[in-house]
Amino acid sequence: MYAIIKTGGKQIKVEAGQEIYIEKLDADVEGTVEFGEVLFVGGDDVKVGAPLVEGAKVVGTVVKHGRAKKITVFKMKAKKNYRRKQGHRQPYTKVRIEKIEA
């Protein structure tokens, strides 16, 4: 059984036992988190939401919080001596999907 959930402005396909990286959540490590915005549940009994599946939720456990690799943003205007260099590290949360309830 799998589901498509919406979190952090993205849609993610998840299965029980899978570990996913999502946008940072305000939750403690080893704490449980519930995703109520379930768009689709697949498997033997398919349920399609319009836009959400009623009564469906996905339960997971927070494994860790972290920051992604650094990216460099560089702006430049040719021949004008304008240069701006900036780095960014996006925070994330790693979640282990425990079960899908539909």
Swiss-Prot record:
InterPro entries: bL21-like, bL21-like_sf, Ribosomal_bL21, Ribosomal_bL21_CS
Pfam families in the record: Ribosomal_L21p
GO biological process, one term: translation
Keyword vocabulary terms for this entry: Ribonucleoprotein, Ribosomal protein, RNA-binding, rRNA-binding
GO terms of molecular function: rRNA binding; structural constituent of ribosome
Any one cellular-component term (Gene Ontology): ribosome
Lineage top rank: taxon: Bacteria
Complex formation: Part of the 50S ribosomal subunit. Contacts protein L20.
Family: Belongs to the bacterial ribosomal protein bL21 family.
Role of this protein: This protein binds to 23S rRNA in the presence of protein L20.
Protein's name according to its UniProt entry: Large ribosomal subunit protein bL21
Organism this protein belongs to: Exiguobacterium sp. (strain ATCC BAA-1283 / AT1b)
Lineage of producing organism: Bacteria, Bacillati, Bacillota, Bacilli, Bacillales
